[in-house]
Amino acid sequence: ASQQGETMSGPLHIGLIPTVGPYLLPHIIPMLHQTFPKLEMYLHEAQTHQLLAQLDSGKLDCVILALVKESEAFIEVPLFDEPMLLAIYEDHPWANRECVLMADLAGEKLLMLEDGHCLRDQAMGFCFEAGADEDTHFRATSLETLRNMVAAGSGITLLPALAVPPERKRDGVVYLPCIKPEPCRTIGLVYRPGSPLRSRYEQLAEAIRARMDGHFDKVLKQAV
């Protein structure tokens, strides 16, 4: 028990990507502070390639991100699968639907994040498979910019479920679950191979996994 206490005390530098950090942290920070009161958490936000470089150099202890090919060089601990929902403006022809078939996106142009965001690449993959394309007139710097562009009637987009509000419709945006297939990304905790603090990261991952268990079932039910 004393060893566990030592493992979960002291400073911990955690990196998070911008499309995860602001949306996941409110769910987990109070729980982590209560569960591991002696842990001093320092949070760093950057894009995937920057975080992995800082993890490799030792500037960061661990990183929470959407698992990608580049993270395979590290120890990956999957936390949860996060669905993506279609965000459309409130007077869009699909606004009263309960869900959207991915095949329905064929021929549509979707708003996307700018280069460097892994969510951009993942969303583009799902869109291309469905026969959709990118709206090349605009690339957003953040999910909030994307959301506001949708509210303004400038287009539609895929948003990760953590960024979706509890209501199916809010501030001029309607959120619809996508099916056949359901687009999603795997969020994981990543750390350096051979790290002496492996136990710390595994305990952290287990606590986050338990906290988020079943969370997206509720989100998708509310969206319908």
Predicted regions, residues:
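Alpha-helical linker/hinge and terminal dimerization helices associated
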Residues: 1-5, 204
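Short secondary-structure boundary/capping segments
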Residues: 4-6, 33, 75-78, 94, ...
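Central regulatory/effector-binding core of bacterial HTH transcription factors
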Residues: 9-72, 140-142
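Short, well-ordered beta-strand segments
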Residues: 11-15, 63, 87, 111, ...
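Hydrophobic hinge/microswitch elements
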Residues: 47-60, 65-66, 114-174
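Flexible hinge/capping segments at coil-to-helix
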Residues: 71-84, 88-110
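Secondary-structure junction motif
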Residues: 94, 109-130, 197-206, 211-221
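C-terminal effector-binding regulatory domain of bacterial HTH transcription factors
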Residues: 161-170, 180-224
